[in-house]
């Protein structure tokens, strides 16, 4: 499949993408990063509806849409009819009736998108910007793009995902696709935040068992808004037991990279001074987020043409 010929009706989960489609999106993101342009004969309208706080995902989608020449219809939850009790379904039904081509949505409800993509009335396409602790496909794709740029392949790479596993949509999206692409996965973090689901994709370990063996060390944000982690750990204890300290950083392979979906809780998941260390690709992830989201929006617009 050519990188600029992928066409998607919606993008709601990594599970709905084939390996071929994933690679096409990654390669198209790299092409956009290298200066490729997309040209459209007509204007397209994209609405960004974020029902949870977001900086990177929200603004990266906006920049991606602007770079593609789309008209943006930004949606402020605080001033919308959501405050009058309007359901998500009726909000998106309205967007569809107004002629919006794509709705990018972040919502706290897991699988919120199912009734939207199954509706015979809603014609707008749905791009999932994160559904509770469910899926985060655009973050997963930018992570994959970052790894692919570094190593040129996924087969045989050793990847450790460490931290707040159970509450992380990033972990769930990444474990599924990385396993499919041939990576060897390890999961580290507090036992309280490990569900059996992860054991189907990799091995549970301590961070000290793998930090010197893996190619990718991916830390996860502690999800303060989804649980009270300080009832189990102090910030200092969490960092000492499960975070990236200087000593652990020094043990990483010279060719290994450090990743985090951000925002980083500095001195909790990663020592403050290591966030921009030489092995860190956290800033690169943010940059790649714009270009892979350009690839996503382009692919969905192509899907609407069919």
UniProtKB/Swiss-Prot annotation:
This is Aspartate carbamoyltransferase catalytic subunit. GO terms for cellular component: cytosol. The keyword Transferase applies. Pathway: Pyrimidine metabolism; UMP biosynthesis via de novo pathway; (S)-dihydroorotate from bicarbonate: step 2/3. L-aspartate binds at residues 84, 169, 221. Belongs to the aspartate/ornithine carbamoyltransferase superfamily. ATCase family. Gene3D superfamilies: Aspartate/ornithine carbamoyltransferase. It catalyses: carbamoyl phosphate + L-aspartate = N-carbamoyl-L-aspartate + phosphate + H(+). Keywords: Pyrimidine biosynthesis, Transferase. The keyword Transferase applies. It comes from the Bacteria. It is an enzyme of class 2 (transferase). Carbamoyl phosphate binds at residues 56-57, 106, 136, 139, 262-263. Its EC number is 2.1.3.2. One of its GO terms (biological process) is amino acid metabolic process. It comes from Streptococcus gordonii (strain Challis / ATCC 35105 / BCRC 15272 / CH1 / DL1 / V288).
